[in-house]
Amino acid sequence: MFTPTLDARQVRAVIKELRGIDQQIVKDLRSDLRSQLAPVATQIAGAVPVDPPLSGFRNNGATGWSPVKGKVGFTPGKSRNNAKNLVAIRVDPVGGKRGLYIAELAGSRSAGSTPSGANLISVLNSRSPMNGRGGRYAYKQFRFLRPDVVKIAERILNATFAKIDRKID
């Protein structure tokens, strides 16, 4: 079976070569990745409910619920946590509220260490169950769309490599 993968180390090496050839090609690559993956980021952000999943998230404090926005980032260099991602799709709440992060990740590592935490996780699981690990809303949608993201990124990278080949020849 064929599994499409992007090796970030090879891409970083290519980008290093690109910088030596032409900065405009790197800018075009970033622009193409952002523009082509923006609809996917919007689709992932659309999987997050607008209304809070529990009444406790309906507040104006730091743990409140707020609308979310999908963003696409391009990371050609080394990341801070040694991740090997080429493209980062983030779903961030507007206004810096943390309710999404709490609801998204609650129960991903444990069943809750306090009775209130266990209750939060059980109610969230009854309303929107978490499949495996990762997340309840945005990450679940990302896992569904990941093959499309890989195909789009590969298509853009192949087009960029073809441009470089034409330029070198």
Regions found by a protein language model. Give the residues of each.
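Charged, low-complexity interaction tracts
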Residues: 1-8, 47-169
